[in-house]
From Swiss-Prot:
Gene3D superfamilies: Ribonuclease H-like superfamily/Ribonuclease H (3.30.420.10). InterPro entries: RNase_H, RNaseH-like_sf, RNaseH_domain, RNaseH_sf, RNaseHI. This is Ribonuclease H. Residues 16-157 form the RNase H type-1 domain. Coiled coil: none annotated. It catalyses: Endonucleolytic cleavage to 5'-phosphomonoester.
Length: 163
């Protein structure tokens, strides 16, 4: 594994608006268990933070959900860079998904693809945009990634009703 961030693009229509930066992260307390996600969207000097949770989920589902919920907030086609510490998300969208689709949503071991519902939704949401997927190392001092992790954990705490 390289310490250099991976940068990959998914094919999408050309976008005509200013670039959007999305930082996202998912977290789980137990895996599976209660989970949360957090995301930061930046556009034209504006910033929006979002977070959410599910009572019983996995870390990977929260990673995918973070990206999905951020994409849902965009109202027109955009150039987007999505930055995440999830290789599962980046490789899924840039390397694996075409093969899964060709094989009828089976992985290379001929098993059903996990989280297919979320992958299909991510494909649908990203199809309207020009998306670049960037991996960064988690818990390595990247301010936005740390903030997204904090938002995800805060969402879990709020769901549990803790102060």
């Amino acid at each position: 594994m390289s310490a250099r961030p991976d940068q990959s693009r998914t094919a999408a229509p050309s976008a005509t608006t200013s670039p959007v930066e999305i930082y996202c992260d998912g977290a789980c307390s137990g895996n599976p268990g209660p989970g949360g996600y957090g995301a930061i969207l930046r556009y034209n000097g504006h910033e929006k933070e979002i977070r959410g949770s599910e009572a019983h989920t996995t870390n990977n589902r929260m990673e995918l959900t973070a990206a999905m919920e951020a994409l849902r907030l965009l109202t027109r086609p955009c150039r987007i860079t999505i930055v995440t510490d999830s290789q599962y998300l980046v490789k899924g969208m840039t390397e694996w998904i075409q093969g899964w689709q060709r094989r009828g949503w089976q992985n290379s071991k001929k098993e059903p693809v996990l989280n297919r519902d979320l992958w299909e939704e991510l494909l649908k949401l990203s199809a309207h945009h020009d998306v670049s997927w960037q991996w960064i190392r988690g818990h390595a001092g990247h301010a936005e990634n740390e903030r997204c992790d904090s938002l995800a954990r805060q969402a879990i705490t709020e769901m549990r009703g803790a102060p």
